[in-house]
Amino acid sequence: MSRATVGRAGAGAGHGPSGGRSAAPTGDGGRRGGATGTDATPGARRIRAAFDAAAEEGRAALIPYLVAGYPDARTSLAVALAAADAGADLLEVGLPYSDPLADGATLQRASSAALRAGATLDRSVELIEAIAAARPGIPLVPMAYANQLIGGGDGRAAARRLADAGASGVIVADLTPDEGGPFEAAARDAGIAVVYLVAPTTAPARRAAIAARTGGFLYCVSLVGVTGARRSLPRAVGRYVAEVRAVSSVPVGVGFGVSRPEHVRVLRRAGADGVIVASALVDALGPDGRDVAALGRLVGLLRVATGA
C-alpha cells in the first residue's frame, strides 16, 4: 500500500441512508451524537441535506474538487462558481500543501503552482469565504493535512476559522480516528464535520468503526494509491462500495480515479451516494489552469451521469 493510501485509508468512514436504510453499528464506542464523532454538528447536517436532496432526485451527489489558489486566487474562485453553476451539490476545496502525500501528479502540480502564485492557508480560507458568500446553498468541505491545521496543537483555531469562513466540514487526509479525538472536539465546538476515509485495504471491522466516527459522509477511496485520472476503475469497485455501504449509516462518497461520466454511472449503480471528481477537472482547465468553460462543461456531463 502506498503511503498515500495509508494516510487516507486509516482516516475514517460514514455513510448516509438514501431513503430509509437502517443505521449501521457504531463500533468502537463511536456513539452518534455522543462524545465522539461530528455527525450531529450543523455542518454535518448541511452536508447530509445535500446528499438527501440528490437522492430525492434519484441520483448521486456530485462533488467536484478544486485546488484553492490554482492557477491564481481570482481564477480559482471562478472555477468554484463554474462548478457550482454546472451542477455541483457540494464542493471539496483542496488547501495547497508542500507535501500532499495523497495526491498524484496532476494535483501535486496544481498545488505547487498555487503555492508559487502566493497561496497560503489564510488566502485559502478567504477563498472559502468568498465561495460561501457567492453560493451559500452549496456545502463546502476543505481538504487539508494534519500539519496544516493541527500542527502541535488540537486544531481549535483552524476549525473555528474554517467554520467562520463558511465550511460545513473538513477532510484531514492523514488523520485517523485513533488520533482524531482532540480535533473532533474542536470541530464539534466550531459546528463542522470531520470527514474520515476508508480504502480497499481497510479491514471490514475497521470500516465499521471509522463509519461510526465520520461526520456528514464517508469518503470511500476507490483504489490503492494516489489521486489521478484513470481510464477505468478497479473491477472490484462495485463489490467494495456495496460492502462499505453495508456498514455505514451516513452517505458514502467515492473518490480517487473518478474521471469520466461512465465512472460516475458505474459508482451510482454500485450504490455510491456521491462521487468526487478531482484530477480530471484540473486537467480540463488546460496547461495554464484557466479554461474555466471547459471545466464547466465537464461538470455538466458528470452531473447528467449522476442520474443515469
Predicted regions and their residues:
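Glycine/Thr-rich beta-alpha phosphate-binding loop at enzyme active sites
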Residues: L197, R207-A242, A246, A284-G289
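Catalytic beta/alpha-barrel core
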Residues: R116-A119, A167-E179, A193-T202, R207-A208, ...
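Glycine-rich phosphate-binding active-site loops on the catalytic face of alpha/beta enzymes
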Residues: D89-P100, G169-I171, T176-E179, C220-G228, ...
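Alpha/beta catalytic cores of nucleotide-metabolism and tRNA/nucleoside-modifying enzymes
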Residues: M1-R3, G27, G37, A242-G253, ...
